[in-house]
Amino acid sequence: MSADENNLIWIDLEMTGLDPERDRIIEIATLVTDASLNILAEGPTIAVHQSDAQLALMDDWNVRTHTGSGLVDRVKASTMGERDAELATIEFLKTWVPAGKSPICGNSIGQDRRFLFKYMPELEAYFHYRYLDVSTLKELARRWKPEILAGFTKQGTHQAMDDIRESVAELAYYREHFIKL
């Protein structure tokens, strides 16, 4: 398949916390959809190696969540650093979307972009400057039509690929039930 500038790149990161000055990326996953939200391909899901010292900085929520999902063990066992994960992700994306064309897509994606800017700047630059943030629609629905929210439930596994799939499904749900096309 040739790269299509209308395809959308969806991304999710798991981090050791929310502060890019202190915390680090521990998992990255991407997938590509067409403009109609049909999933075309899933990219690599990569546990990003971090030192024991870095992992020790996690707060209780992150320790509990990422240990429970098995991510901490995968991070410790991983041989891929941030740069390797960045390059593998870009290599996957080149097949599906030309550089600079897709907005960065996901849930609360501004937070992920802050970490990409700091730790994976080449990948961050691969995206268009625009955002397709599903959480914007969630916040609007909460204020304008709160009953809509009951129709979509997330599993909340805090595993990157699961979270991306849920983001795509959530946007499709809002397209059907909230946005008048």
UniProtKB/Swiss-Prot annotation:
Gene source species: Salmonella typhimurium (strain LT2 / SGSC1412 / ATCC 700720)
Cellular component GO terms, alphabetical: cytoplasm
Domain Exonuclease, residue spans: 8-171
Enzyme class: hydrolase
Main location: cytoplasm
Encoding gene per record: orn
Role summary: 3'-to-5' exoribonuclease specific for small oligoribonucleotides.
HAMAP family: Oligoribonuclease
Record-listed E.C. numbers: 3.1.15.-
An annotated GO BP: DNA metabolic process
Protein name: Oligoribonuclease
Subcellular location: Cytoplasm
